[in-house]
Regions:
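A structural motif corresponding to the C-terminal end of an alpha-helix
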Residues: 12, 39, 70-82, 108-114, ...
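Acidic/polar loop patches that form or flank catalytic/metal-binding clefts of enzymes
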Residues: 17-20, 83, 112-119
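Catalytic cores of alpha/beta
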Residues: 31-34, 91-108
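Flexible glycine/acidic-rich beta-alpha junction loops that bind and position SAM and/or redox cofactors
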Residues: 54-59, 88-96, 112-170
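Non-membrane alpha-helical structural segments and their capping/turn regions in soluble enzymes
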Residues: 62-69, 95-102, 170
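Conserved, mostly hydrophobic/aromatic
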Residues: 46, 84, 105, 117
Length: 178
């Protein structure tokens, strides 16, 4: 993907610059980040979602906080800007989970590992991994609210307790602007 684009772009005159949408994975080493930067990558966007080890495990993110931080270090050392998507309001998220996630995010900003971030509210959808896992008996604490059979093309599914996290929306986004 990005590596092939960067290599191909190196042959262009003039080279294009581009922004990539990625997953923070351990494959993003300093050498790869340097190559991507030389090949025109100026910034990346990626979802951290929950900046805690237990949170990443719960949502089956497929990566660990250590890999996310290592990838961010590699990108920043290569001069690449980083934007992260954060998510709050998971069905099983406690206020302490949210505080821990915000603290990790604060530390990442303090260390210069992130340039920007935005908090999004979790939305359960019919085709999401979480919903499919719930159908298989996983996530017994998730309680989807049955939809009306007449709802056409409605992908979002409400769940019990989702409104309890709404009170965090404004404070989380305000904290990013400090």
């Amino acid at each position: 993907g990005l590596q092939q684009l960067a290599l191909s772009n190196c042959k262009q005159n003039p080279k294009l610059t581009f922004w990539g949408n990625i997953r923070f994975e351990k494959t993003f080493t300093r050498d790869l980040a340097d190559l991507l930067s030389y090949g025109g990558l100026t910034a990346v966007s990626a979802g951290i979602e929950i900046a805690t080890g237990s949170g990443l495990s719960t949502i089956n993110k497929g990566t660990e906080i250590e890999h996310i931080i290592a990838a961010c270090c590699a990108f920043k050392e290569a001069g690449i800007l980083i934007h992260s998507y954060m998510i709050f309001g998971f069905w099983n998220q406690t206020p302490q989970d949210l505080i821990n996630s915000m603290e990790t995010l604060r530390q990442m900003f303090q260390e210069g590992l992130l340039d920007s971030a935005f908090w999004h509210k979790f939305t359960l959808t019919k085709h999401s991994t979480v919903y499919k896992e719930w159908e298989q008996g996983k996530h017994p604490d998730l309680k989807p609210i049955p939809q009306s059979p007449t709802q056409f093309a409605q992908n979002n599914i409400s769940f019990e307790g989702e409104e309890k996290s709404q009170k965090y929306s404004d404070p989380l986004n305000a904290a990013l602007n400090q």
